[in-house]
A protein has these predicted regions:
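Active-site-proximal loop/helix segments of hydrolase catalytic cores
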Residues: 1-19, 123, 127-130, 191-266, ...
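Short, well-ordered alpha-helical packing segments
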Residues: 6-13, 27, 279, 283
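C-terminal regulatory/interaction regions
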Residues: 212, 222-225, 229-235, 252-256, ...
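Flexible, acidic/histidine-containing loops and adjacent segments that form or flank the divalent-metal
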Residues: 11-214, 290-291, 295-296, 306-319
Length: 319
């Protein structure tokens, strides 16, 4: 996700003269907004700077070729791109972190209401404390100074943490080898009840969008279980969290929530997404017939749902 946003911000250019699309505001939590530890006087130097630069390289799209030149990250982190290109950043939160304790409801227009569901301060504190603890394992006397390099290092570290967490969960969620005709035969009882404990996923920005009588849920990668009790019993559109992983949506939610459309965003090539139990439950246990809209025509879901292109074409022909 970080790499995609970096690429978009680089290509879109200046916020006042965008190449691709105009963006009114960006919600993004950088280290400088969520870190609560007091900053030290002085500057970053020596071994500390070297370690921070190494962490920063892990998350930059321009360093994937194997380059160890820190200059490739300068000006190219999400935080620096937002500032450098003049984007309005977390303005609805008065420049502070996007979290439920700061602002819970945002009116995007007279008719569009955004209810923030996640993260809370607890999730953000866990995230930043994990990173600080990791840094202290590398640097005994780790200190925080007022330097943009901390944002870059934090951003790069989270990409690496997220990848490691995905690798650990593959065996639990894999759908490889399962054909579309088999999803209805899956034994739902085998659905794992473990909730995703990934600190990166649990700090995802999640929100419920309401326009007139239309309701849309965008949980990001956060497990829906964290805010399930706050949700209405009917939702028009739900974007499946974490590419349809079983650890990020509960069987209870699918069985008890009337959803018209589930959006599935995955190419199916990494980590075995989507989880067969999730697809099987939507097909057989949802209280009303729900349509699955895919952004890729996955071979394992060949006869299930529609691609976004097909859905858009049908919508246009109806009108």
């Amino acid at each position: 996700h970080i790499g995609g946003i970096q690429a978009f911000l680089q290509e879109n250019g200046d916020a006042d003269n965008p190449v691709i699309i105009g963006v009114d505001e960006v919600w993004y939590n950088a280290f400088s907004q969520i870190a609560t530890e007091p900053k030290q006087q002085g500057s970053v130097s020596g071994y500390l700077r070297m370690v921070l630069q190494g962490k920063a390289l892990q998350g930059n799209i321009n360093s994937k070729s194997g380059s160890h030149d820190i200059s490739v990250t300068q000006g190219n982190t999400v935080a620096e791109l937002l500032l450098g290109h003049g984007y309005h950043w977390n303005e609805r939160f008065m420049g502070r972190a996007v979290c439920t304790e700061n602002v819970e409801t945002v009116m995007l227009s007279d008719k569009i209401r955004c209810n923030l569901l996640n993260p809370g301060k607890e999730e953000l504190n866990q995230l930043v404390n994990y990173w600080i603890s990791d840094m202290k394992r590398n640097i005994r006397n780790f200190k925080i100074y007022d330097d943009v390099l901390y944002n870059a290092a934090f951003e790069g570290s989270l990409v690496n943490i997220s990848t490691e967490e995905h690798e650990r969960e593959i065996k639990n969620i894999s759908s490889s080898g399962i054909q579309s005709s088999d999803y209805r035969k899956i034994n739902i009882v085998e659905w794992e009840t473990r909730i995703d404990h990934s600190i990166t996923n649990r700090s995802s920005i999640s929100f419920l969008l309401q326009y007139d009588d239309i309701t849309l849920l965008f949980p990001g990668d956060c497990p829906i279980q964290l805010f399930q009790e706050k949700l209405p019993k009917y939702i028009d559109v739900v974007k499946l969290p974490h590419h349809g992983s079983w650890a990020n949506i509960s069987r209870e939610f699918i069985k008890n929530t009337s959803v018209s459309y589930y959006l599935l965003s995955t190419d199916g090539e990494k980590y075995g997404h989507p989880s067969p139990s999730v697809i099987g439950s939507i097909m057989d246990e949802a209280p009303i017939p729900a349509k699955i809209i895919k952004n890729y025509d996955l071979s394992q879901l060949e006869t299930i749902g529609e691609t976004e292109g097909e859905a858009l074409w049908k919508s246009k022909t109806k009108n």
